[in-house]
Every structure is written in structure tokens, then in C-alpha cells.
């Protein structure tokens, strides 16, 4: 299962780097929870798909160049759910060039029919926009 989960997040990485919003949406349940430093929200996939292009554009304009999968730790909760801690390596462009920064998120995945995985809960452990902004003045 660990290899399957790693493949899932490599697919997530590819979807995140492409302009094909629907491929990002394919990885999420129809309704999911999103948590971050400001709290937790229930999100409908259709609403999420409307926001993704604006979010990508905003982060790109701030200097986000690339997001790459770094680490994946999988912990089965039961036969249907997996807790996954993921490390991302993000590349941020600032006035002195590009800098790599680590970001972390925890996901709860649901294992559906045919072992298909979907994100039902995502917790970002930092506000990505704040992380990118903090790198703009770093040399």
C-alpha cells in the first residue's frame, strides 16, 4: 500500500504543476475537510475546483516556482482510511534567485472501490502564502 500511496501523491504533484484543474479534483472526495493555521473548513469539490486556478495564479505571482514530493509516511487507520504525513519541497523565486523550502501536510485518504484513493481531510501545517512571502526578503 505504501507504493500505491506514494504513486497517489506523485499524481497529486503532477496535477498541481499542470493547468488541468480536473486532474487535481480527481484526487479529492466530493466533500472534504481542509485544515490550516486558521482553522478547519468543509469544502465541496466543485467549489474547490473554482478556486484552484486563482490560488495557483496568486502563489505563482508571489514567487512559487515548483512543488515536489519529498517524503511520504503512511499509517493505516483501519481497512478504509489511511493517515499520511507528506513533506513537500517548494521552490520559491526571490530577488537573489531560487530557494528551496520544506512544507508539510497531513492527509486522511479514503480507500474506495478497486483500492481507489481520495483525500477526505487535508491539514496544511503552515500557511503557504506566508511561507512564500517570508522567502522574498531572504538572501
What role is predicted for each listed range?
Residues 1-30, 135-139:
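Short, low-complexity N-terminal intrinsically disordered segments enriched in polar/charged residues
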Residues 9-12, 16, 28, 48-55, ...:
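Hydrophobic alpha-helical core bundles mediating ligand binding, dimerization, or RNAP-core interactions
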Residues 35, 84-85, 120:
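Beta-strand residues in well-ordered beta-sheet regions across diverse protein folds
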Residues 90-100:
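Short, cysteine-centered beta-strand-loop-beta hairpins and adjacent loop/turn segments enriched
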Residues 99-137:
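Short beta-strand edge/turn micro-motifs at domain boundaries
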Residues 48, 69-75, 88-90, 104-111:
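Hydrophobic/aromatic beta-strand elements that line small-molecule binding cavities or substrate pockets
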Residues 2, 21-74, 80:
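A solvent-exposed, acidic/Ser-Thr-rich amphipathic alpha-helical stretch
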Residues 31, 85-92:
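Generic short beta-strand segments
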Amino acid at each position: 500500500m505504501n507504493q500505491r500511496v506514494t504513486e497517489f501523491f506523485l499524481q497529486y504533484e503532477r496535477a498541481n504543476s499542470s493547468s488541468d484543474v480536473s486532474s487535481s479534483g480527481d484526487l479529492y472526495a466530493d466533500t472534504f475537510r481542509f485544515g490550516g493555521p486558521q482553522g478547519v473548513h468543509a469544502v465541496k469539490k466543485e467549489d474547490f475546483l473554482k478556486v484552484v486556478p486563482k490560488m495557483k495564479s496568486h502563489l505563482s505571482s508571489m514567487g512559487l516556482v515548483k512543488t515536489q514530493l519529498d517524503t511520504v509516511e503512511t499509517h493505516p487507520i483501519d481497512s478504509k482510511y489511511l493517515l499520511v504525513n507528506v513533506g513537500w519541497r517548494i521552490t520559491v523565486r526571490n530577488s537573489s534567485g531560487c530557494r528551496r523550502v520544506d512544507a508539510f501536510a497531513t492527509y486522511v485518504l479514503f480507500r474506495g472501490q478497486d483500492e481507489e484513493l481520495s483525500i477526505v481531510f487535508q491539514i496544511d501545517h503552515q500557511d503557504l502564502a506566508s511561507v512564500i512571502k517570508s522567502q522574498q526578503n531572504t538572501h
